[in-house]
């Protein structure tokens, strides 16, 4: 029987990620969430990229230059009696693979929508990934300090496009220059908005009760409009149902403005009250419960060079069960070795601290000297592998060339490390000495060349290559696989993990090969 202190620690944890379309305000909301968690005294303004005042969660050099979040940061802070782990994900559309993998390490998600634009395509893609595990979703309709679309239309769009029921928790009163605040439906109170309070926590100005005459004094004719609107909203929308939320079937909807620092506390209250505590995890042999005494965890991301002064890499691990203690012995299942871990890290977006202990739901960082890969499982001796950390087939390809041919060794080392980290995928064709780089979006190519130069002192350039797509190939029959390998060697390559991959010049070529070799499986995704 697990002891009560251990259970209390698990029950306190809330681990979530923010998902949104680029520019819906995700980085701003991350800042404000941290401000409420007292993790930041003054939220970093995201606008001021050139003024040297960078957002706290965008800390890699390239992100600071560009003003976009490229890699996942992890931030832990206390709020309302809970301990919240926020995983910030790349907002830029070219970094979707890293984002997808991060979603495997959380128990719930906050979806941020630009209320002027509604549901956008990146949000649709990310929601598809959360659907793989029926992750509970909290929704924040952002940018109420601008003119927005009709709130009922916005909720209809979420329901129809994303196929999830909406239950409004707060309701906006006006928008843009006329934004007055929100009505909290469950608490029956109006919270009034003050502009110009973006960097400090606003003093809460609350009027209790929708029929309170003080409301008419405070917001004039908007009070009568609100009462009429609420009659309509109550009749037309869903009530919040906690069980449906936990199944990923219904999302509570909050309205506010992250830039104006308004409504963010409502979201955090909702996450602490309703979002699931650390959930059980599937492995290839059994389901692992968080309150099991023995430690287990899996690696969902590898980040190179978090400390520019040191050429190090850190593996981000989600703790799934048991308790991490400094100096403990862990079993690295893939390579079958025991390791002593005395220097795991906790994070506050690039500021590291040594972790004394960690519990299920927490994210810790392990120093990685090249032995840890994405998807690796760590236990206290038991042999199993956590499942559900996917690799996605790249959609774009380039051949990479050196300006200085003598640096081939450094180039390969850099590319292999970057591929293990998940920044890019590397393919080595069986029949040539080419190196092919595959990515989900163009910006990843730029990032790789930039990092090869700054971290490995290698100047590389890209050339176009006629590759349309890649598929990992498997076959239960060794003989048939060997025959396929012999006959199709000009289209085969090994990826960074030495997995056999089919490199298709066109979709027509891929379809023909699939017809010709029905016993070979051509896979779009691969478990790490």
Curated annotation (Swiss-Prot):
What InterPro entries does UniProt report for this protein, alphabetically?
EF-G-like_DII, EFG_III/V, G_TR_CS, P-loop_NTPase, PrfC, RF3_C, RF3_dom_3_sf, RF3_GTP-bd
Entry keyword annotation includes Nucleotide-binding: yes
SUPFAM superfamilies in UniProt: EF-G C-terminal domain-like (SSF54980), P-loop containing nucleoside triphosphate hydrolases (SSF52540), Translation proteins (SSF50447)
Carries keyword Coiled coil?
Answer: no
Tell me where it resides. Cytoplasm
Residues bound to GTP: 20-27, 88-92, 142-145
Tell me, what is one Gene Ontology molecular-function annotation carried by this entry? GTPase activity
Its function, per the record, reads:
Increases the formation of ribosomal termination complexes and stimulates activities of RF-1 and RF-2. It binds guanine nucleotides and has strong preference for UGA stop codons. It may interact directly with the ribosome. The stimulation of RF-1 and RF-2 is significantly reduced by GTP and GDP, but not by GMP.
Instruction: From the Swiss-Prot or TrEMBL record, give the protein name.
Output: Peptide chain release factor 3
* Organism per entry: Shewanella sp. (strain W3-18-1)
């Amino acid at each position: 029987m697990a002891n009560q202190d251990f259970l209390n620690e698990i029950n306190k944890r809330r681990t979530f990620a923010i998902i949104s379309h680029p520019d819906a305000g995700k980085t701003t909301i991350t800042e404000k969430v941290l401000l409420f968690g007292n993790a930041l005294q003054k939220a970093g303004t995201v606008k001021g990229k050139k003024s040297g005042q960078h957002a706290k969660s965008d800390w890699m050099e390239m992100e600071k230059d560009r003003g976009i979040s490229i890699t996942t940061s992890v931030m832990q802070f206390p709020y309302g009696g809970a301990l919240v782990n926020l995983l910030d994900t790349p907002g830029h559309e070219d970094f979707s693979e890293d984002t997808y993998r991060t979603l495997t390490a959380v128990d719930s998600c906050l979806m941020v929508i630009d209320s002027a634009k509604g549901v956008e395509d990146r949000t649709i893609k990310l929601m598809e990934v959360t659907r793989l595990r029926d992750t509970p979703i909290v929704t924040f309709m952002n940018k109420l300090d601008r003119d927005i679309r009709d709130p009922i239309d916005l909720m209809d769009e979420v329901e129809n496009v994303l196929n999830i029921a909406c239950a409004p928790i707060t309701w906006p009163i006006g928008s843009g220059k006329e934004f007055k605040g929100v009505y909290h439906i469950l608490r029956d109170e109006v919270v009034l908005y003050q502009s110009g309070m973006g960097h400090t926590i606003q003093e809460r100005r609350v009027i209790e009760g929708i029929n309170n005459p003080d409301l008419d004094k405070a917001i004039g004719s908007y009070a009568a409009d609100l009462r009429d609107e609420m009659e309509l909203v109550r009749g037309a929308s869903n009530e919040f149902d906690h069980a449906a939320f936990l199944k990923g079937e219904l999302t509570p909807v909050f309205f506010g403005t992250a830039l104006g620092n308004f409504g963010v506390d409502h979201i955090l209250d909702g996450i602490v009250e309703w979002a699931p505590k650390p959930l059980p995890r599937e492995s290839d042999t059994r389901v692992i419960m968080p309150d099991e005494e023995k430690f287990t965890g899996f690696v969902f991301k590898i980040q190179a060079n978090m400390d520019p002064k040191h050429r190090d890499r850190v593996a981000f691990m989600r703790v799934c069960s048991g308790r991490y203690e400094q100096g403990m012995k862990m079993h690295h299942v893939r390579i079958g070795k025991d390791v002593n871990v005395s220097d795991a890290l906790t994070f506050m977006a690039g500021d590291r601290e040594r972790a004394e202990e960690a519990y299920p739901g927490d994210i810790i960082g392990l120093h990685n000297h090249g032995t840890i890969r994405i998807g690796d499982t760590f236990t206290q001796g038991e042999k199993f592998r956590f499942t559900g950390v996917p690799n996605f087939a790249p959609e774009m390809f380039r051949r990479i060339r050196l300006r200085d041919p003598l640096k081939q060794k450094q180039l390969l080392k850099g590319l292999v490390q970057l591929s293990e980290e998940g920044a890019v995928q590397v393919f080595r064709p069986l029949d040539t000495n080419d190196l092919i780089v595959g990515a989900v979006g163009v910006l990843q190519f730029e990032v790789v060349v930039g990092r090869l130069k700054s971290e490995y002192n290698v100047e590389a350039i890209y050339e176009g290559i006629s590759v349309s797509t890649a598929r990992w190939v498997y076959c239960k029959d060794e003989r048939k696989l060997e025959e396929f390998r012999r006959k199709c060697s000009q289209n085969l390559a090994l990826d960074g993990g030495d997995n056999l991959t089919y490199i298709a010049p066109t979709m027509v070529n891929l379809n023909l090969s699939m017809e010709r070799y029905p016993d070979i499986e051509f896979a779009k995704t691969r478990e790490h």
